[in-house]
Amino acid sequence: MNCEREQLRGNQEAAAAPDTMAQPYASAQFAPPQNGIPAEYTAPHPHPAPEYTGQTTVPEHTLNLYPPAQTHSEQSPADTSAQTVSGTATQTDDAAPTDGQPQTQPSENTENKSQPKRLHVSNIPFRFRDPDLRQMFGQFGKILDVEIIFNERGSKGFGFVTFENSADADRAREKLHGTVVEGRKIEVNNATARVMTNKKTVNPYTNGWKLNPVVGAVYSPEFYAGTVLLCQANQEGSSMYSAPSSLVYTSAMPGFPYPAATAAAAYRGAHLRGRGRTVYNTFRAAAPPPPIPAYGGVVYQDGFYGADIYGGYAAYRYAQPTPATAAAYSDSYGRVYAADPYHHALAPAPTYGVGAMPQGSSPSTDFRGAKLHTSRPLLSGS
């Protein structure tokens, strides 16, 4: 019974709680019909009741949970609306350049259309000339230039037409491309820029050599013997170094300068061949009396020419013409020689072979077969 009473008491106490709970809600319902402001002030009254805080918190939380959810829901549309507004703003910003671009593009197009344009016309009849091509394209607009490419045999079958206005050029290209003129299908295309290639500079010498005087004297001795050695000898002012007036040397000889053979022209110095001279060189000139006593260094371009000195004068000599008719002769290598004025005073000289060279002056041959001779002093008498 006691337990039942306690349960009843507990039930009575629990039943009393809803009555008290109903009062604050009932009191709070009167204010909202007038204004929203009294409700805000009447709502705090139930909160101070300490006995029902545990029970009232749940409905309060439930009540408070809805407004925040509503506020969040209200804020989210605002945010979305703000986002949409900002998005539209960005779109309008982006749209502004797009609106401006069509304005700039027509100006660029008009500028391009007003510029000259060149067309490449190919497969045109070979009898066509510039007036014919101008007449064909002149109906589409003003033409600045017409050019048909020719070679030594005539027209090459293509040319160029330059219009003052690029729009006229485009219209002419569309109309005339693929048309048949005198049995030939004409092709009209936009001319492309030429690709400029680096052409080799033209060398003043026809053989393509551009050497310094030392190396050039080896590979082109006659040129430097005429322009360097003899000019230097004439500048000395001495009779023993003077060159004969019959020798003609020009500095404009192209490449290997082998001019026409004259009576006294001997570029290889035939009067010195086989004499046992101190230093043999390609700097030798003709055979004037007295002979030139000084010669430069000793490198021969070809081994065959160097070998004839060791073989002796008689071993190398060819059949000499008579003194009355002796002018000049040339061997099979294109070298021009004059008749030796001293051959009547010379006997066959086998002693001027290799054995006649002093010790320590044996010939040395490089990879070109060139021979170096340094047997006697630089200067010697005749």
Curated annotation (Swiss-Prot):
What does the UniProt record say this protein does? RNA-binding protein that regulates alternative splicing events by binding to 5'-UGCAUGU-3' elements. Prevents binding of U2AF2 to the 3'-splice site. Regulates alternative splicing of tissue-specific exons and of differentially spliced exons during erythropoiesis.
Output the SMART domains linked to this UniProt entry.
RRM
Q: Name the SUPFAM superfamilies on file.
A: RNA-binding domain, RBD
The gene designation is RBFOX1
Ranges where the record places region Disordered = 1-121, 357-382
All copies of the RRM domain together span: 117-193
Compartments in which it is found = Nucleus; Cytoplasm
* Listed name of the protein: RNA binding protein fox-1 homolog 1
| Modified residue annotations for Asymmetric dimethylarginine | 317
Q: Name one GO molecular function term.
A: mRNA binding
Compositional bias (Low complexity) at which positions?
88-99
Composition-biased stretches (Polar residues): 70-87, 100-113
Q: Chief localization class?
A: nucleus
Annotated site, Interaction with RNA, chain positions: 118, 126-127, 151, 156, 160, 184, 194
The Gene Ontology biological process terms listed for this entry are: mRNA processing; nervous system development; regulation of alternative mRNA splicing, via spliceosome; RNA splicing
Instruction: Give the highest taxon in the source lineage.
Output: Eukaryota
- Pfam families assigned: Fox-1_C, RRM_1
